[in-house]
Amino acid sequence: MGGGVLKQQFVLHAPFLPCGDQPEAIRRLSQGITDGVPAQVLLGTTGSGKTFTMANVIANVNVPTLVLAHNKTLAAQLYQEFKAFFPENAVEYFISYYDYYQPEAYIARSDTYIEKSLLINDEIDKLRLSATRSILERRDTLIVSSISCIYGIGSPDNYSSMALTLEVGKEYPRSQLSSQLVRMHYQASSTPQRSAFRERGSVIDIFLAYESDLAVRLEFMNDTLISIEYVDPLTMIPSHTTSSITLYPGSHYVTPEAVREQAIRTIREELEQRMLFFEGRPVEQERLFQRTTHDIEMIKEIGFCKGIENYSRHFTGAAPGEPPTCLLDYFPDDFLLIIDESHQTLPQLRAMYRGDQSRKQSLVEYGFRLPSAFDNRPLTYEEARRYFHRVIYVSATPGDLEIQESRGHIIEQIIRPTGIPDPLPEIRPAKGQIDDLLEEIRQRLRKDQEKILVISVTKKLAEDIAAFLAELGIAATYLHSGIETAERTQILTDLRLGNIDVLIGVNLLREGIDLPEVSLVAILDADKEGFLRSSASLIQFCGRAARNIHGKVICYADRITPSMDHMLKETERRRKIQLDYNQQHKITPQPIIKPILANPITKEAGQEETRLKMQSSKELEASIKTYEEAMYQAAQEFQFDEAAKYRDLMNAAKKQLLFQKGEEENGD
């Protein structure tokens, strides 16, 4: 496994101290880790400050930490929160880097081959490489990850062995250095771009694969390195110097030459065996031979090929069926694993492997891939559990699995620092529920900044209710899995900004949606037993109203199901704990005030485009650089809407520059 090098301390920055039952939860969780307890549960209600508790535990135990979330939206939210808590430490983000992904597949019944199609998000690729660099270099690393952490990536041994350490005063033949950078997946380029380098006289500028704020400038006298400077990648203005530097590869799939040669030999051996298997099936034989030999030639020439991950077992030296190397292998043995919303995340861990294997079966069976492609896969749940040496399951509604594995090490965190108790749900008849809901919505629309969440049982019903309310002049929309991640984030922002008053959803409104403006949660057809109306789901839905002092929950049902009964009893129990605490400490519930990050250029966009038309060519070039820098900065902070506007301004400046240059040429 990978190991940390630098031994910095986690330094927690927080404008407040632990309160309520946070101090006891922090103490018990920290002590459990120190005592070697393998699994613990933090059972924390919505709004009780679970993330703050996690941050305190991380600071106390001071070991590399992986926080696992079940979707990208929650991972981004946790990443931002931990970045604020640990500004001095390496807080990283590791999710799937695909903006679009159509996996390779073959449908035998229609003889249809679907080639893999994808669009990689450059910014997320950078963040992934930054994450692995940090965990190999320093112990004060906290990585927030989606389920991507169990998918195969290159070996940490190969990755770290391809890192290049340079020291001032030593000799590095320039041609050899350039060749080494190419082998590390940096490309020679005359323009500044990530994972690239350029040579100008005695200087080599390297634009790092894992860093957008800094580039590296190497200055030579003949072949002797006389200076290493960090510079701004846009302006090339020096920031600071260093006497040595370690440069990490531009891809997780880099391999030393000896490993690559061995991999080519074993790929050829597997191909020969498969040719014998397909004896009498010339179509499959030819198909597999052509593809595999082409891939081998590409690996020989440039060390890479399209779909190289399907040969990953050959590069790691693993036996057939052995677990792939993944992000978890980059961590040292003593790392802490925190699984957020564990009741959702653990079932996801179980499901990933089965779906992957069923898709690849036909690819291998019909000669599109070698059988080793099966080993380019996510971990099975049993394989993933081998890394659970120190795990904290975090959930308001932990499942039976977490309860069982924790063996009684369950720490409750029920009390909210705000003093807001769980709203006690009202049960109303399902008959006429839409008319009753409409009246409740109208009551809240008369008040300022109170929003409504409506939980339906199907996507179609969510869309129909949104359309019905919109026809009545109510600002309503729906949210479900058919909507892209970026658009979901924008919808939630619009709700907080007041552009939307009513949001109708199915399942996405359960965990992690932090909306203090929501004063009413209406659960339609609450008596329809099933996954979306289980006691855990109902408790999670009710928690969405527990951030507002006027919070109210209405369950529309004609009967009280066992799940509803459990939800009502558990809500009453938690409510009593909070009210008793409030009375004992003379606490008056206070509303949560959570700032909304406004877009600083929304009102000025039109003025900016007008100003561009008045600029000279030189000024436009400067504006393009400024907008590009602002775009990447906004993307780093996960303000994607803001980043898109800077992108549009950058493109407008580029068009204006082309127009002006055309006019200048015509004028000449």
Swiss-Prot record:
Domain Helicase ATP-binding intervals: 31-416
Motif Beta-hairpin per UniProt: ranges: 97-120
Binding site residues for ATP: 44-51
Record-linked Pfam families: Helicase_C, ResIII, UVR, UvrB, UvrB_inter
Keyword ATP-binding in annotation: yes
Principal place of residence: cytoplasm
Helicase C-terminal domain residues: 433-596
InterPro entries: Helicase/UvrB_N (IPR006935), Helicase_ATP-bd (IPR014001), Helicase_C-like (IPR001650), P-loop_NTPase (IPR027417), UVR_dom (IPR001943), UVR_dom_sf (IPR036876), UvrB (IPR004807), UvrB_inter (IPR041471)
Keyword line: ATP-binding, Cytoplasm, DNA damage, DNA excision, DNA repair, Excision nuclease, Nucleotide-binding, SOS response
Gene Ontology biological process: nucleotide-excision repair, DNA damage recognition; SOS response
GO MF entry, a single one: DNA binding
Subcellular location: Cytoplasm
The UniProt record lists the keyword Secreted: no
Residues of the UVR domain: 621-656
Listed GO CC annotations: cytoplasm; excinuclease repair complex
Description of how the protein assembles with itself and partners: Forms a heterotetramer with UvrA during the search for lesions. Interacts with UvrC in an incision complex.
Biological role stated in the UniProt entry: The UvrABC repair system catalyzes the recognition and processing of DNA lesions. A damage recognition complex composed of 2 UvrA and 2 UvrB subunits scans DNA for abnormalities. Upon binding of the UvrA(2)B(2) complex to a putative damaged site, the DNA wraps around one UvrB monomer. DNA wrap is dependent on ATP binding by UvrB and probably causes local melting of the DNA helix, facilitating insertion of UvrB beta-hairpin between the DNA strands. Then UvrB probes one DNA strand for the presence of a lesion.
Domain comment in the entry: The beta-hairpin motif is involved in DNA binding.
HAMAP family: UvrB
Family in the record: Belongs to the UvrB family.
Protein name: UvrABC system protein B
Gene encoding the protein: uvrB
